[in-house]
Curated annotation (Swiss-Prot):
Family recorded in the similarity comment: Belongs to the class-II aminoacyl-tRNA synthetase family.
Catalytic reaction annotation: tRNA(His) + L-histidine + ATP = L-histidyl-tRNA(His) + AMP + diphosphate + H(+)
Entries under NCBIfam families matching the protein: hisS
EC number: 6.1.1.21
Gene from which the chain derives: hisS
Keywords, sorted A to Z: Aminoacyl-tRNA synthetase, ATP-binding, Cytoplasm, Ligase, Nucleotide-binding, Protein biosynthesis
Lineage summary: Archaea, Thermoproteota, Thermoprotei, Thermoproteales, Thermoproteaceae
Official protein name in the record: Histidine--tRNA ligase
Main location: cytoplasm
Record GO terms (molecular function): ATP binding; histidine-tRNA ligase activity
Amino acid sequence: MSGLPEHLRRPPRGMRDWLPPQLYALIEMEERLSKVAESFGYRRVETPVVEHFEVLAKKAGQEVVNEIYYFKDKAGRDVGLRFDMTVPVARVISYNLDLPRPVRWYYFTKVFRYDEPQHGRYREFHQFGIELVGSASPRADAEVIQVFIEALEAAGARDYVVKINDRRAVDKLLESLGVLQHRDVIYRALDKKYKLPREQVVDIMTNGGVPIDKAERIYDASEEMTLEEAVDAVLRLDAGLGSFYQKLVGYLATAVPVDRLRFDMSIVRGLDYYTGVVFEAYVGKYRLAVGGGGRYDDLLELYSGVKMPALGFAIGVERLMEAVGLERVEKPLDYYIYIFDDGAYPHAVALAKKLRAAGHSVAIELGEKNLKDAFEYILKVGTKYLIIMGRRELERGVVKIRDLQRREEFEKPLAEF
């Protein structure tokens, strides 16, 4: 038999297989991030991978809708694979309105986007994130940003910057310039500020109907600044919003390293459901964008009919793993027991049980390799100790142990295990 053709032996485009070293790295990252969320009182939640298409598309924006994996099920219903967890969480909250608020949930799970695959970007990938539902306080914004930063640091990020903005501040700026009606095209342009030259970003705005002088002023207003400078800038736009920012900056100053934070009015986030504070993280020498979040105070009302403030963030786990260099975790076998014949098998099983009960991983030779081949095998798979159960050793009540890391060999009585 010739087997499958080569292209069918590989996963579908944009997907990946997780072999043990990569999977253990993923598990390590999951443990680091989950520990942070749990320490802040967030509890883990999971939802179906498949959602009603209407639920996914309700407030996603056309660009994201175009990336949804969607199909008809066998009953003819339009369904799709979730592209993030914020929308499913909003749906879950919509029929659990009696939950005590604020709700603090987190997740570490797979999501799907039918996007063009790139280095470090897959169509099936993992997201870690939190959702805080039921609070409009700037303390909630500060808490979510604090969890975000502590998660980055727990993951191993040392060189990073978190850029913060507020969609309300951008809207106030557009209103003062008389171009609020061009909001959507301006947001699209600002979202591409660090991907395209200045002229092209301005062209996107002018091609959408924004006068050239206004487009230039919007671009200039989106320059980075410190949080303290941002308070003054936002106060000039709107006193109420400026007061909110004064409180937020004060709370952040007590909780996080503020030198890692910058205010940047070009950070608007690509999803249409954001309504207030938004933020993104850039990690490492090449400033990889690894995640972000913000406020979505109108989203839950779309599903439940009840106005409910909410905010959260999501981190692209694979991108973060690449940025911090956590891409492989080798997990060697603790013990490999080699026996020469079936007579020693009961002794091998008994010893393996003792070692496993003590928390060790143990494999027993299956009887298909001679000692030389078994030795080559365990070196390839990674093993700490080789235990040899020969007939003469068993007669003396001992086993021979090879420490493969120190390259030492010694005997040990079976009674001492």
